[in-house]
């Protein structure tokens, strides 16, 4: 009994478990605590889903044509430092300028012996199977 009051623990089937905490203000009385008090947010309205009043601001957009043609703007990932300077075209690999930046090619435009053809064919068959199986009843 004395250890129960002193240490605030009881013997349970699983082992020693916390029972109640001692209240230092009142000696000898035990105080049961519940969950912690919910934090109060500044500018928040009462109720669920209250939005704070802080608004996000957009990043600064560079409009200087000299900087836009000599630096890769917005590529620097560090807080401090400069943007990456652009190199001459001869220093970049050749495949970089051969990339298809437009819409993807259709099956008729691709060579049947290429890997891209078979990947595209497999993707279209998966899309077709998903469309057909969406309407099936269980």
Swiss-Prot record:
The gene is MRPL54. Its main location: mitochondrion. Residues 1-14 form a transit peptide. Disulfide bonds: none annotated. Component of the mitochondrial large ribosomal subunit (mt-LSU). Mature mammalian 55S mitochondrial ribosomes consist of a small (28S) and a large (39S) subunit. The 28S small subunit contains a 12S ribosomal RNA (12S mt-rRNA) and 30 different proteins. The 39S large subunit contains a 16S rRNA (16S mt-rRNA), a copy of mitochondrial valine transfer RNA (mt-tRNA(Val)), which plays an integral structural role, and 52 different proteins. GO terms for biological process: mitochondrial translation. It comes from Homo sapiens. The keyword Transit peptide applies. GO terms for molecular function: RNA binding; structural constituent of ribosome. It is found in: Mitochondrion. The keyword Ribosomal protein applies. It comes from the Eukaryota. It holds the Pfam family Ribosomal_L37. Keywords: Mitochondrion, Ribonucleoprotein, Ribosomal protein, Transit peptide. InterPro entries: Ribosomal_mL54. This is Large ribosomal subunit protein mL54. GO terms for cellular component: mitochondrial inner membrane; mitochondrial large ribosomal subunit; mitochondrion. Belongs to the mitochondrion-specific ribosomal protein mL54 family.
């Amino acid at each position: 009994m004395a250890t129960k009051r002193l240490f605030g623990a009881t013997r349970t089937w699983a082992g020693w478990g916390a029972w109640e905490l001692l209240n230092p203000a009142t000696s000898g009385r035990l105080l049961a605590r519940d969950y912690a008090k919910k934090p109060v947010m500044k500018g928040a309205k009462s109720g669920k889903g209250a939005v704070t009043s802080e608004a996000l601001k957009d990043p600064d957009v560079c409009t200087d044509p000299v900087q836009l043609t000599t630096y890769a703007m917005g590529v620097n990932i560090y807080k401090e430092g400069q943007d990456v300077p652009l190199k001459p075209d001869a220093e970049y690999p050749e495949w970089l300028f051969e990339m298809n930046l437009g819409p993807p090619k259709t099956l008729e435009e691709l060579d049947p012996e290429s890997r891209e053809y078979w990947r595209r064919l497999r993707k279209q068959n998966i899309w077709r199977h998903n469309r057909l199986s969406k309407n099936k009843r269980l």
